[in-house]
Protein backbone atom coordinates (compact mmCIF):
# COMPACT_ATOMS: atom_id res chain seq x y z
CA UNK A 1 0.00 0.00 0.00
CA UNK A 2 1.48 3.34 -1.04
CA UNK A 3 0.20 6.46 0.63
CA UNK A 4 1.72 9.90 0.59
CA UNK A 5 -0.57 11.32 3.28
CA UNK A 6 -2.24 10.09 6.43
CA UNK A 7 -5.61 10.72 4.78
CA UNK A 8 -4.70 8.34 1.96
CA UNK A 9 -3.54 5.77 4.50
CA UNK A 10 -6.86 5.93 6.35
CA UNK A 11 -8.76 5.69 3.06
CA UNK A 12 -6.78 2.56 2.21
CA UNK A 13 -7.31 1.11 5.68
CA UNK A 14 -11.07 1.68 5.39
CA UNK A 15 -11.10 -0.27 2.12
CA UNK A 16 -9.08 -3.16 3.52
CA UNK A 17 -10.54 -6.26 5.15
CA UNK A 18 -8.60 -5.48 8.33
CA UNK A 19 -9.89 -1.95 8.83
CA UNK A 20 -13.39 -2.30 7.49
CA UNK A 21 -15.09 1.08 7.23
CA UNK A 22 -13.99 2.88 10.38
CA UNK A 23 -16.81 5.43 10.33
CA UNK A 24 -19.44 2.70 9.93
CA UNK A 25 -18.00 0.89 12.99
CA UNK A 26 -17.66 4.00 15.19
CA UNK A 27 -20.18 4.25 18.03
CA UNK A 28 -19.93 8.07 18.15
CA UNK A 29 -20.31 8.49 14.38
CA UNK A 30 -23.40 6.27 14.57
CA UNK A 31 -25.02 7.52 17.76
CA UNK A 32 -28.55 6.18 18.21
CA UNK A 33 -31.57 8.47 18.16
CA UNK A 34 -32.17 7.36 21.77
CA UNK A 35 -28.80 8.79 22.83
CA UNK A 36 -29.22 11.95 20.75
CA UNK A 37 -32.01 13.00 23.12
CA UNK A 38 -29.27 14.05 25.57
CA UNK A 39 -28.00 16.77 23.19
CA UNK A 40 -27.22 20.02 25.04
CA UNK A 41 -25.18 22.05 22.58
CA UNK A 42 -24.01 21.86 19.01
CA UNK A 43 -21.11 23.90 17.60
CA UNK A 44 -19.26 23.79 14.30
CA UNK A 45 -16.85 21.02 15.44
CA UNK A 46 -18.22 19.63 18.72
CA UNK A 47 -21.43 18.26 20.19
CA UNK A 48 -22.16 18.33 23.92
CA UNK A 49 -24.33 15.62 25.46
CA UNK A 50 -25.60 15.33 29.01
CA UNK A 51 -24.29 12.01 30.33
CA UNK A 52 -27.09 9.52 30.93
CA UNK A 53 -25.64 8.81 34.38
CA UNK A 54 -25.67 11.92 36.54
CA UNK A 55 -23.47 10.59 39.34
CA UNK A 56 -21.94 14.09 39.18
CA UNK A 57 -24.60 16.75 38.58
CA UNK A 58 -24.03 18.31 35.17
CA UNK A 59 -21.76 15.52 33.94
CA UNK A 60 -21.35 15.80 30.15
CA UNK A 61 -19.53 14.32 27.19
CA UNK A 62 -18.11 16.56 24.46
CA UNK A 63 -17.76 14.72 21.15
CA UNK A 64 -15.84 15.78 18.05
CA UNK A 65 -18.22 15.76 15.07
CA UNK A 66 -15.76 14.26 12.60
CA UNK A 67 -14.14 10.89 13.13
CA UNK A 68 -10.71 11.37 14.70
CA UNK A 69 -8.84 8.85 16.82
CA UNK A 70 -6.33 10.91 18.81
CA UNK A 71 -5.81 14.39 20.24
CA UNK A 72 -2.67 15.16 18.17
CA UNK A 73 -4.82 14.78 15.04
CA UNK A 74 -7.12 17.68 16.03
CA UNK A 75 -6.99 20.71 13.75
CA UNK A 76 -6.18 24.15 15.16
CA UNK A 77 -9.79 25.34 14.72
CA UNK A 78 -11.07 22.28 16.61
CA UNK A 79 -8.65 22.93 19.49
CA UNK A 80 -9.69 26.59 19.67
CA UNK A 81 -13.38 25.76 19.67
CA UNK A 82 -12.82 23.11 22.38
CA UNK A 83 -10.99 25.70 24.49
CA UNK A 84 -13.92 28.12 24.13
CA UNK A 85 -16.42 25.34 24.95
CA UNK A 86 -14.48 24.48 28.11
CA UNK A 87 -14.57 28.11 29.25
CA UNK A 88 -18.29 28.41 28.47
CA UNK A 89 -19.20 25.09 30.13
CA UNK A 90 -17.24 25.80 33.33
CA UNK A 91 -18.74 29.28 33.66
CA UNK A 92 -22.24 27.86 33.18
CA UNK A 93 -21.87 24.91 35.61
CA UNK A 94 -20.26 27.12 38.27
CA UNK A 95 -23.00 29.74 37.92
CA UNK A 96 -25.98 27.37 37.80
CA UNK A 97 -24.92 24.64 40.25
CA UNK A 98 -22.07 26.31 42.17
CA UNK A 99 -19.53 23.66 41.12
CA UNK A 100 -16.13 24.14 42.72
CA UNK A 101 -14.23 22.94 39.63
CA UNK A 102 -14.48 20.43 36.76
CA UNK A 103 -12.46 17.33 35.94
CA UNK A 104 -11.80 16.90 32.21
CA UNK A 105 -10.63 13.59 30.76
CA UNK A 106 -10.08 12.06 27.35
CA UNK A 107 -9.93 8.35 28.13
CA UNK A 108 -9.74 6.18 25.04
CA UNK A 109 -9.10 2.83 26.76
CA UNK A 110 -12.47 1.19 26.20
CA UNK A 111 -12.09 1.40 22.41
CA UNK A 112 -9.09 -0.91 22.64
CA UNK A 113 -11.05 -3.75 24.24
CA UNK A 114 -12.21 -4.59 20.73
CA UNK A 115 -10.05 -6.69 18.39
CA UNK A 116 -10.59 -3.88 15.84
CA UNK A 117 -10.40 -0.65 17.89
CA UNK A 118 -12.18 2.39 16.49
CA UNK A 119 -11.34 5.33 18.79
CA UNK A 120 -13.20 8.64 18.48
CA UNK A 121 -12.19 11.78 20.37
CA UNK A 122 -14.59 12.62 23.18
CA UNK A 123 -14.05 14.45 26.46
CA UNK A 124 -15.69 13.50 29.77
CA UNK A 125 -16.57 16.41 32.06
CA UNK A 126 -17.25 15.80 35.74
CA UNK A 127 -18.20 18.86 37.79
CA UNK A 128 -17.09 18.55 41.42
CA UNK A 129 -18.95 20.00 44.38
CA UNK A 130 -17.59 21.09 47.73
CA UNK A 131 -21.11 21.89 48.95
CA UNK A 132 -24.44 20.07 48.54
CA UNK A 133 -26.45 20.81 45.39
CA UNK A 134 -30.23 21.18 45.81
CA UNK A 135 -32.44 20.66 42.76
CA UNK A 136 -36.25 20.58 43.08
CA UNK A 137 -35.96 19.86 46.80
CA UNK A 138 -33.52 16.96 46.30
CA UNK A 139 -30.05 17.24 47.79
CA UNK A 140 -27.02 15.82 45.98
CA UNK A 141 -23.67 15.33 47.70
CA UNK A 142 -20.24 14.85 46.16
CA UNK A 143 -19.01 12.49 48.88
CA UNK A 144 -15.68 12.04 47.10
CA UNK A 145 -14.92 15.75 46.73
CA UNK A 146 -11.18 16.26 46.95
CA UNK A 147 -10.47 12.70 45.76
CA UNK A 148 -10.22 11.04 42.37
CA UNK A 149 -13.73 10.08 41.23
CA UNK A 150 -12.76 6.42 40.69
CA UNK A 151 -11.10 5.95 44.07
CA UNK A 152 -14.33 4.78 45.69
CA UNK A 153 -13.23 6.68 48.77
CA UNK A 154 -15.98 8.39 50.71
CA UNK A 155 -15.75 10.75 53.63
CA UNK A 156 -17.86 10.25 56.72
Regions found by a protein language model. Name each.
Residues 2-156:
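HIT superfamily nucleotide-processing domains
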